[in-house]
């Protein structure tokens, strides 16, 4: 029977578990925070049986679970016996770092109903010592920024290829209908030869071979396409390094029916050949 990849994210309060779960979610994991340990096996079973297969699961489990958390070791033993494979990611930080983070966030420590903040941090560290010893991967976030933690998570659990970490949407549009509001990059191609003024091409779209041939018959189009794709391929690794997981490239002409459609389609083809995950969408292709 198919079983999904299961990562249990745990560790010290304030060490970055929430950000780790967000990073795993960006990598395509189905994430649930603060799930009672007794439900882990059942949850993994439900995910395995889901109509749309869930390949990767990340569960946040920590001391907030109170008495439920105490059952974690027995639960892990049980799922071992059931053949469910899992990894434990444990996040920690120095006492000084955790004290500073709690003071800056002004949020209470889960154990702060008694004792000073440093005392409860040390108490939690002591309670989690055995779980830390079971961890497959331990990350000390004391000197990490959020971006660095995200990069570390991606290096451990992400796909090995850079291309797979970013989903690119290429959208064609017409300037007369407005620029897509969620665009990251906008390019104006109204300087290219316009098929609209060719009677035989006017009623066609940039998806039709005749229109594409007309648009790309211009040396200017070919030169522009080379320079533009070189720019995109240069930018993508830098966007990924900054932690972007989605990129929308908007290509616009006057009405969004001919030139922008042809170029968006070509750009999508080029990026797919480089193994990038690409969706091509033509926003205004059916507008009159």
Swiss-Prot record:
Q: Keywords for this entry?
A: ATP-binding, GTP-binding, Nucleotide-binding
Question: GO molecular function terms here?
Answer: ATP binding; GTP binding
**Binding positions for ATP?**
11-18
Q: Which domain of life does this protein belong to? A: Bacteria
- Give the binding site residues for GTP: 62-65
Which Pfam families does the annotation name? PapZ_C, RapZ-like_N
**Similarity comment: family membership:** Belongs to the RapZ-like family.
The name this protein carries in UniProt is Nucleotide-binding protein PTH_2729
Origin organism of this chain? Pelotomaculum thermopropionicum (strain DSM 13744 / JCM 10971 / SI)
């Amino acid at each position: 029977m198919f079983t999904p990849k299961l990562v249990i994210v745990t560790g010290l309060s304030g060490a970055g578990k929430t950000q780790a779960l967000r990073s795993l979610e960006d990598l395509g994991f189905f994430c649930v925070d603060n799930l009672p340990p007794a439900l882990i096996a059942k949850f993994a079973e439900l995910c395995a049986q889901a109509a749309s297969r869930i390949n990767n699961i990340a569960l946040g489990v920590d001391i907030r679970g109170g008495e439920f958390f105490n059952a974690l070791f027995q639960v892990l033993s049980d799922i071992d016996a059931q053949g469910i494979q899992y990894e434990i990611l444990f996040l920690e930080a120095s006492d000084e770092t955790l004290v500073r983070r709690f003071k800056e966030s002004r949020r209470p420590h889960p154990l702060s109903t008694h004792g000073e903040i440093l005392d409860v941090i040390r108490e939690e560290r002591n309670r989690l010592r055995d779980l830390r010893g079971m961890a497959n991967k331990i990350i000390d976030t004391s000197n990490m920024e959020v971006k660095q933690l995200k990069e570390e998570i991606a290096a451990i659990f992400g796909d090995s290829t850079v291309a797979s970490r970013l989903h690119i949407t290429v959208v064609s549009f017409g300037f007369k209908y407005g620029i897509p509001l969620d665009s990251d990059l906008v390019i104006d191609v109204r300087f290219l030869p316009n098929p609209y003024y060719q009677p035989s091409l006017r009623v066609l779209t940039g998806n039709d071979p005749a229109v594409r041939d007309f648009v790309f018959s211009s040396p200017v189009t070919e030169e522009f396409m080379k320079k533009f794709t070189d720019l995109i391929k240069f930018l993508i690794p830098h966007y990924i390094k900054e932690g972007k997981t989605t990129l929308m490239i908007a290509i616009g002409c006057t009405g969004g029916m001919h030139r922008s459609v042809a170029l968006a389609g070509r750009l999508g083809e080029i990026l797919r050949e480089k193994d990038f995950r690409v969706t091509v969408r033509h926003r205004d292709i059916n507008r009159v």
